[in-house]
Structures are given as C-alpha cells and as structure tokens.
Amino acid sequence: MRNHHLRRLAGTVAALALMAGAAQAKGKTFALIQYNQQVSFFTDITKGAQKAADEEGDKLVVFDANNSASAQDNAFDTYIQQKVDGIILVAVDPDGIMGSVKAADKAGVPVVSVDAALPPGPQKAGITVDNEAAGKEMGAFYVDYVKKNMDGKASLGVVGALNSNLQLLRQKGFESVTGADAGITKVGVVDGRNIQDQALAAGENLLTGNPKLDTIYATGEPALIGAIAAAASQGRDKVKIFGWDLSAQALAAIDAGTVVAVVQQAPDQEGYKAVKALDTLTSGGKVEATIKVPVEIVTKANVDKYRAAYK
C-alpha cells in the first residue's frame, strides 16, 4: 500500500515537472525597439505590447531609442547577441535600419515592424495604418469644414515632420485633396522633426510669418501639441487646427474649440497585434505580411469615449 502511494506521488511530481517545463518553454522573450518613450502614441504601443505579452506568458523588454536611428542599430546588435525570440521595431529611419533587420533575419530572429512601414525585406510583418489614405480622409473633412464654416476660403499652414516617411505620407494625402480646392491657400510647411519643442518653435514661426493664417494641419502628436501651444502663446485662438493623435492637450483644445478634428489611431492595438504576430510566427504559424489598423476622425461629437485614456 505504501509503495502504491509512493508511485502515485512520484507520478504527480513528474506530471507537475512536465507542466512547469511546458510553461517555461511557452514563455518567449521579445524585444520592442521603440522610437521614443516620451510621446503617448509610442507609450501606448508599449502598453498594448505588454498586455499581449502578459496574456501569452511572454517576456517583453523595451529599448527607448530616444529618436536615434544609430541607437536602434545598436539595440539590434545587442538583442541578436542575447538571442531574443523576436524583435518589434518602431523605426526612426526605415531605410537605414534595414541592414539590422537583415542581420536579425540571418540570425533567425523574426522582425515585425509597427507604425512606420519598412522597405521590402526579410521582415515577417508590418502593422500600421494607411497613412496616405487617412491623410486624404482628413483632407476631405477639412475641405468640407472650410466650406460649411469659413465661406469656402482658408489659408493653410502645415506643421510636419520632414524626417518621418509616414508623416510625409499623411501630408501628401491631405494636400492631394486640399490642393485641389481653389478656396484654400497653402502658405507653407514648417518642420517640427517629430519633437515637441521643435514643433512648438516651428509652429510659432509659422504663425509669426503669417499673421492672417487661419488653419493648421499637424501631421503627428508632437506637431499637434506644438501647434496648439504656439497658437495659445500668440493669442491666436481663432486659428483652427486639424491633426493626428490624441493627447491630454489635444482633448483640452477640442473642448476649447481650437482643435476641430484629430485622426486617432489605435497604437495600443498596433503593439498588441505585434506581439501576437511574433507569438504566432515563433510557434510555427503564419501571419499576413501587412496588418492594417483602422483610424477614426475624432471631433467634439465623438471625443467622450476617449477621455478616460488621457486623464
């Protein structure tokens, strides 16, 4: 009888050991190489990625490149040497980073990009919005607003990020629509370089140089926050601003009537889908090469559902 109990106990211990081993084997380590961790859009990507990693029992390590392409290259070297199971990339320089993406692929480390689309290469998937199409959608919204609220005439300035391929696509899409309207006069583009302080200075220069400017299009979160702050600092509360990516500042400006509309992405979903894609890939599965995430134009009419995320 005692031997029977011992055999049962040994079997239970062995089963538990197998279960523990299986759980340990399931957990993977993924590296998220971020653009920066100061802008809420990027931190939301990180939050979504962490949520998916927690669900899958994976470990997520995050590297903040602080807007530096060379830092991202160095991070690739480190994570390849550490033999992580996969890399998620929010690229500062999509073209320049491809050497590192190829090195990771050669080392057997799959790469999934988020936000900025990479050139053709060995990356396994890209998760992003259609930036040019969304720019066109905002352009159509802007033209309709000008017709209904400004007698069909407006002067337009752009606070962009000329170092960002995806923000150039947003600008291109927007201008392809607004440029075809004879009532809209474009006065110029200033470069905020996707850095909030620089976007503020660029926005101030745009407003100072164009005292009759009455509308601004901002192509990203730093550009939008910079444009809002620039208009406030110069007492230009009549200027109507259209842009990308909600923030606490953008919400307050929507309430004040300064910001008319914002293209809102789902960065948390982008990060979430990236980890899920890597988990599928490293388990022998397949994913779509391009995974699109939808956008929504946010105005006073539908902003309330977003408030909780920016308190």
What function would you assign to each model-found segment?
Residues 2-9, 18, 23-311:
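A residue-level marker of the well-folded mature domains of exported/periplasmic proteins
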